[in-house]
Every structure is written in C-alpha cells, then in structure tokens.
Amino acid sequence: MTKTTDRRKFLAAATGGSAAIAASSMAAPALAQAAPEVSWRLTASWPKSLDTIFGAVEFMAKRVAELSDNKFKIQVFAAGEIVPGLQALDAVQNGTVECCHTSPFYYYGKNPAFAFGTDIPFGMNARMRNAWMYFGGGLDLMNEFHKEFNVTYLPAGNTNAQMGGWFRKEIKSIEDLKGLKFRIGGLAGTILSKLGVVPQQIAGGDIYTSLERGTIDAAEWVGPYDDEKLGFVKVAKYYYYPGWWEVGPTVGVFVNLEKWASLPPAYKAMLQVAAAEANQWMSAKYDALNPQALKRLIGAGAQLRAFPPDVIESCWKVTHEVLDDVASKNAKFKKIYDNFIAFRNDQYLYTQVADLAMDSYMARLRAQQK
C-alpha cells in the first residue's frame, strides 16, 4: 500500500477529522463556482421507524449536501417507496436508483461472499471490522468481488453487537432448540437449522403478532433500543444474548459502478467522507441509546439470559463447518474468508490482553458497587 493510498483510506475512515473538514472548507468556494449539480436517489432497506439506522443514511445525505455546497444531492427513500427493502441492491444494479443503503448479507443468495459486507457468525465487533475494512484489505477485497455485480461499496453504519433474541420459553440446553420456530434468516438460519431449529422468514412488522399468537417461538431483531419499540417484552419475556451471528454488523451504501465512475473526484471524496461519518454516527448513537433501553426493558419484565455454554459451543462448531464448506466450493468467498479469519484471530489475540481485560475488570467493579 502506498503512502498516498494509505492517507486516502485514513481520511475516509477518520469520520469528520480535522483534515477532512479543512479540505472541504478550502474546496467550497471553488466548488460553488465550478462544480456540476448532481441529483441522486437512494433506496434504503429500512422503514423510517428504525430511526437510528434510517437516520444514519439521512445524516450521510445531509453531509454530502453540506460538503458540496448543495451541488451534490442525494434523496433518500425508505423501504417500499421505490422498491421493497430486500430488492435495494437489484435497483442499484439495474440503474433504477444510483445507490442504496442496506445490509450486504441480505444478498447471500446471489453469492455467499456478500456476507462479508455485514459480518459472518462469530465475526468481529464494529471496531475490528473497521480496522479490517480500512486497513486490513477487507474493503479492497470486497469491492473486487462487487465489480461483477456492477456496484461498489462504502461502509456507512454499524448497529454494534446485537442481542440473541426474544424467546417464549427458557433455553436450558441444546435440546431446547429442537423444533424451535425461530424468526431468523440468512446464514444464521442455515446454521441453526442443523441444530434442529426451524428458521422462519417473517417481516419485522409481523414479528409481534407471530409471537403473540404462538406462530413462532422466538425472534431476533436488533438490540434493546429497536426491540423496545416493537414491544416484544409483552409477548416473549426471555431476552437472550449474545447475538453471535451479528457481532458487529456493518450496513453500507452500494453505488452503481457507472454512476460512481461519472462522479467528479471531489464528489467521490465527499461521499466517502460522509459515509465514514455515518458509520461512526450510527455506532455511537446505538451505544448511547441501548443501555437505557435495556434498563427499561428489564423494568418492564424482560428476563436477561445468556445462551447456555453447550448452545454456544455447538453453534461455533457448526458455523465453521458451514463456512469451511462454502469456502471449499466458492473461490471468491474463500479469498475474502481466509483474509477475514486471519485478521479476526489477530484482533482477538490483542483484545484479550487489552480491551477485554480492562472491560472485564470494569464490569466486575460495577457489579461490586451495586
């Protein structure tokens, strides 16, 4: 990696850093005189009610407008206003819209390698993922793969570690998973099905009713702040953790390759900086909102439970069997997978003696002070 390339990646990752701010301020007068007016449409995979996820892409669009002196405008549409949420990538590929804000793992069916744009089960937390994408070669590897789908990808948000879901009954061992009707999809659904779970694909707006009626036994959504809004605590009191299938899930912007190529270099830089700022904005906002939401949920009757050790151990084992099998059959998946796993293992080696040690100590102190 050259010093120039490294600097560009840092500026894109430095979310609102002084260098980016200074550069944009100096460029503004020239842009106002010479820059073309560009109007794009962006379709999101989320409803407006998910105000932190949807709010992040609104924030990104606002920043692009500010940085370009309103010369580059992105109009944001919620899921269903142009296309359904799960068709966002298709709309970008075929040119219906210039870009979308989505979770890449929704498109696992197109090619399993899409999963790396969000996360894989037992993956990396948000900070580790940023390190991998910006400085571990992850983003370059993913965008090399994305070219065949006529898109490029910019990380633009992270929910941080998610919860393990709401359950109508307690999970005491791996045996309790057998026959469990669990609203969960994608790669995690495939893994859990091998342990006897019956995965269910249900839209977010239908989860509450399905739990209430007993159509499903459990459901995962996001985390305390978003889960509280949907009222799950009223119909399923056991709230499990951790959400091992989404340790640090990134959401991001797919841009049509032809549209990306047509952007002036300054506009590309603005979009990269705005997306990186949105990445930090979403993660920080969830960190601010989730603790208080969790307290309220516990006050409303939620029973916090950790998945039993045999459940986690079985999920870990099956996860790597599934991923290794996919890698053996899909060269594009394997190329990213090998890089990802090597980086993940190094990250946890360091975290074990740095963050984890300190976090564990502080958690024990907090418990003692109660």
Each model region followed by its residue ranges:
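N-terminal secretory/targeting leader peptides
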Residues: T2-S25, L31-R129, G137-K370
